[in-house]
Regions:
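Ribonuclease/tRNase effector modules and their secretory precursors
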Residues: 1-89
Length: 89
């Protein structure tokens, strides 16, 4: 799986959320759920999982053969609930 992102957006995300897109790749290597995003006209997805003991959400889209990361942040309450519904943790 190949990952890509806009470098300026990566830096902005790091300043805003304290999370680096480089680390977001790890979210796809751990148990996670994927749900469609309803907040954009572009087809986007949320990967919700647990990294280093905390819930994180990666907002991304698929472009050709790559996953393009748009945002990486702590999960919101409703996102954590969706994860719990599936994994029961």
């Amino acid at each position: 799986m190949r990952f890509e992102w806009d470098e300026h957006k990566r830096i902005t995300n790091l300043e805003k959320h304290g999370l680096d897109f480089f680390d977001a790749v790890e979210a796809f290597e751990t148990p996670h759920i994927v749900v469609p995003s309803t907040h954009s006209s572009e087809q986007r997805f949320l990967a919700i999982g647990v990294m280093q003991g905390r819930f994180v959400t990666v907002v991304y889209t698929k472009r050709s053969e790559a996953i393009r990361i748009i945002s990486f942040r702590r999960s919101r309450h409703e996102e954590r609930q969706k994860y719990h519904e599936l994994y029961g943790e």
